């Protein structure tokens, strides 16, 4: 399949010149462009992506037609219903820890920027939140005193290349409890349920109350029974998404969300007892400190609650660590201008940081707040400019001239690391495709994927802005739910600011 031109192209894009630029000792080919991307189109596609990640029985209005029902017996190994939810990336495992973070970030985007989402886009965003929230609610309430945190055998799954509709690898079930605690995954699940309750409160007040009640219970469990889930969960679920930062950040994050959702001062007292910890320069499914501090800054700046100024100052410290030109910056940028944090799925850090920049800028603007990174003055405009540059890079303003969102723009990745996208749909090829047949017939094939996974944001280019577009390169070619989840809010903000 060759890349197809679509309405997602930058409508105002005019290639003015290609120039060889010297930047920090590197040589880069850059394209100058007038106008801006079609943020509204990118927003709609970034949300549509989640339909391609769905597990369970798909609804009649499913728009991604190359997907079908899958994982319909999930949970049966523990005699519970754990159907639904999302596959985290290009495999067929449901990891509760990153799924909960995905839900929290999607919900935060709806809460902050739902007013900038038009019509069906807002409905689709809420549907994406609810698909995950339904699963997390089942995982949190199916068995008293137990939180289910994963379905599927990661090692067995990764030894196969199968469509989710065909998968015949073990669907093991993993959980945490009082005797096998997991404060990290429990507090993140509480954050997700609380955030979703806010995102869905106007649309379905009764459901919102159910989510919040479950969030309270799961947060109490996280505080009462402390420990890292990767130390207690069997199999390799914890190994794939171990909380390397520990669980104090999730306890802070969960408390911050419950403070907002409930307005109960006991959560304020608890998060104050956790203290203000070390500075950080990234925000991810693992380390939530920066996100918690920005979230608490909302109350400090918008509501004038001076008790949270320490968290606001730490949020500013995070920003100073990622701003180009800041004397305290610890962040590398590629020659083409992309924030670079890791060789593995770097764009997850770009989208999460961009969301925090956009959101903190919103709080600054409302309160007429400014601050300084030593000698560098920082305004809301400063933060928005950096966030927009990162989003534009993802959408094609980069040395490759490639959009890293599948289906957006005239040129985008063709061979993403994704089982379902890389194999013919069940509708097109109903016969079962086995574990090893998938590798020989599809994974190792050199052509484009037969299914365009519209809206999927891949791991992204390397530190030199290079992107090989190879299916086997999961570091750069695999999309993840948490990469997209953080981008949704940014795109909603820019779609509302720059109407095409």
Swiss-Prot record:
Name of one Pfam family that matches: Glyco_hydro_9
Annotated signal peptide: 1-30
Active-site residues, Swiss-Prot/TrEMBL: 91 (nucleophile), 417, 469, 478
Alphabetical list of InterPro entries matching this protein: 6-hairpin_glycosidase_sf, 6hp_glycosidase-like_sf, Glyco_hydro_9, Glyco_hydro_9_Asp/Glu_AS, Glyco_hydro_9_His_AS
Main subcellular localisation: secreted
Tissue-specific expression: Expressed in roots and flowers.
Localisation: Secreted
Catalytic activity: Endohydrolysis of (1->4)-beta-D-glucosidic linkages in cellulose, lichenin and cereal beta-D-glucans
Top-level taxon: Eukaryota
Residues bearing attached sugar chains per UniProt: 264, 368
Cellular component per GO, a single term: extracellular region
One of the GO biological process terms: cellulose catabolic process
Motif (Cell attachment site): 471-473
A GO molecular-function descriptor: cellulase activity
E.C. number(s) listed in UniProt: 3.2.1.4
Keywords assigned by UniProt, alphabetized: Carbohydrate metabolism, Cell wall biogenesis/degradation, Cellulose degradation, Glycoprotein, Glycosidase, Hydrolase, Polysaccharide degradation, Secreted, Signal
Family assignment from sequence similarity: Belongs to the glycosyl hydrolase 9 (cellulase E) family.
Name the record gives this protein: Endoglucanase 11
Gene: GLU4
